[in-house]
């Protein structure tokens, strides 16, 4: 029965264009873990690739809601909750347990088809579904990500988040001189793609889902936002992932990079 239910769920996910969907167990529950590829090509700009499309949280949540509704339709007494970014489990760990990828030296999860250019979402339900097993693939270990990191946050000994350009770009308040230099070196006002761009596993990464190839915006300039009130900023950019840390932070970063 649990294999049949699993097949129905995986087949349904495929029907709504989610091609990578597997099962992991978490605290006595089954997690239906899904990957959402977003790589739509490289283009000039000052925003990380993942922030080019409309806000992925909304897109993914809508897809996951369809899966949770489907689960409830085939198992009416079942509970099913959707999570994207914020949830009771580390999404990369769940995806690893579900056999959807392996860890790179940069800490990213790598899928054989998508590389590391994907978002992760999952549905926790109290069905007893057969879990998938982690895969045995390994990172090539070339060390290119170590060399490319603007802040030197990556090394054989681990990851230092305080030197990560992506973390710094989203850190509110006044930055230290060292943090400012790292941000300038990255060239981006929100996020960072340096370690992913040089990763050999991303060389043949599959293209994005349709939703992540539309309404693309690769950058903004200070003149775009400086005269806007916070409310106007929210109305204009509230449907973008880069807007969630607010206008003031983006202004600071834009001024630093000008």
List each model region and its residues:
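Auxiliary alpha/beta "docking" domains used to position bulky ligands
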Residues: 1-138
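Short, flexible active-site recognition loops that position polar ligands and cofactors
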Residues: 53, 57, 240-245
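Short, charged low-complexity linear segments at domain edges
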Residues: 110-134, 158-180, 230-234
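Immediate flanking context of iron-sulfur cluster ligation sites
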Residues: 131-140, 180-192
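Iron-sulfur cluster-binding cysteine motifs and their immediate structural context
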Residues: 144-169, 185-213
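Short Fe-S-cluster ligation motifs
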Residues: 172-190, 221-243
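Gly/Gly-Pro-rich "capping" loops immediately C-terminal to redox-active cysteine motifs
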Residues: 208-228
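Long, compositionally biased charged/polar accessory segments in the mid-to-C-terminal portions
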Residues: 243-258
């Amino acid at each position: 029965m649990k294999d049949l239910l699993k097949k129905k769920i995986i087949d349904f996910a495929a029907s709504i264009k989610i091609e990578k969907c597997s099962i992991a167990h978490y605290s006595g529950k089954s997690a239906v873990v899904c990957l959402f590829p977003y790589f739509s090509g490289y283009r000039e700009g000052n925003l990380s690739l993942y922030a080019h499309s409309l806000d992925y949280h909304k897109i993914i949540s809508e897809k996951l809601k369809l899966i949770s509704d489907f689960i409830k339709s085939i198992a009416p007494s079942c509970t099913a909750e959707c999570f994207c970014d914020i949830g009771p489990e580390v999404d990369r760990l769940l995806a690893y347990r579900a056999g959807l990828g392996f860890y790179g030296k940069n800490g990213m999860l790598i899928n054989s088809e998508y590389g590391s250019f994907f978002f992760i979402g999952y549905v926790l339900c109290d069905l007893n579904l057969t879990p998938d097993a982690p895969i045995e693939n390994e990172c090539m270990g070339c060390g290119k990500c170590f060399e490319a990191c603007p802040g030197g946050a990556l090394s054989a000994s681990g990851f230092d988040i305080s030197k990560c350009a992506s973390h710094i770009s989203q850190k509110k308040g006044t930055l230290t001189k060292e943090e400012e230099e790292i941000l300038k070196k990255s060239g981006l006002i929100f996020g960072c793609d340096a370690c992913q761009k040089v990763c050999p596993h991303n060389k043949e990464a599959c293209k994005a889902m349709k939703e992540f190839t539309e309404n693309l915006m690769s950058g903004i300039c200070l003149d775009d936002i400086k005269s806007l009130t916070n409310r106007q900023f929210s109305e204009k950019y509230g449907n973008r992932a880069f807007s969630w840390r607010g206008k003031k932070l983006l202004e600071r970063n834009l001024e630093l990079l000008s």
